[in-house]
């Protein structure tokens, strides 16, 4: 674990736990070693740090490139191991970077809907299925609640579901990726019930 990451994780936990309360469910579903993708719903800018706090291992995030252009924030998220992705086009460089992260046996955090899905209308992209298929990484679905409308002593909850695998290698067809993506999102939103439907 990067020392700065460990410090930042502790600080975020302290703030979130104090102001809102923080609960984690299903941490036993997260493999502690090996290539891993954690795929989560996304409704708030608080989601990446809160997901990181709930995870029992360090998470490297793919983040939209615009964030890296913000002077202080861009430098901070680079220190935390994040790397940029251009959402306006097929970003081959970021895909190669993501596969490299997974080939090192580390954990990659992705929000399949490609950005904040506040009103529930965004359709999930097939990036998680593609990366999992090419790398052989395990995928753990996750659901975050309580970050959309935070107020003092409201509770933030992150739930981790049972891991799954998409194994087709270079032979994965678009239909396969679409099917796997649909199954992944079904599993992510099925976890909502555990949070109380928030």
Sequence positions of predicted segments:
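Catalytic core of membrane glycerolipid acyltransferases/transacylases, capturing the structured
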Residues: 2-10, 17-18, 30-89, 97
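Short gly/ser/thr-rich secondary-structure transition/capping motifs
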Residues: 17-25
């Amino acid at each position: 674990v990067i020392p700065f990451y460990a410090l930042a994780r502790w600080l975020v936990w302290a703030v979130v736990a104090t102001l809102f309360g923080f609960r984690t469910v299903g941490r036993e579903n997260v493999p502690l070693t090996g290539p891993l993708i954690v795929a989560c719903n996304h409704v708030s800018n608080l989601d990446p740090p809160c997901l990181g706090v709930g995870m029992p291992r360090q998470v490297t995030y793919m983040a939209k490139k615009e964030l890296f252009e913000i002077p202080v924030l861009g430098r901070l998220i680079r220190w935390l191991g994040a790397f940029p992705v251009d959402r306006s086009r097929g970003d081959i460089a970021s895909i190669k970077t993501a596969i490299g992260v997974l080939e090192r046996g580390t954990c990659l955090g992705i929000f399949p809907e490609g950005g904040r899905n506040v009103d529930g209308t965004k359709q999930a992209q097939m990036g998680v299925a593609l990366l999992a298929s090419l790398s052989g990484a395990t995928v753990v679905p996750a659901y975050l609640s309580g970050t959309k409308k935070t107020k003092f002593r409201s509770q933030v909850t992150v739930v981790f579901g049972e891991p799954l695998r998409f194994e087709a290698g270079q032979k994965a067809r678009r239909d396969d990726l679409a099917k796997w993506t649909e199954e992944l999102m079904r599993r992510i939103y099925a976890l909502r019930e555990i949070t109380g439907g928030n």
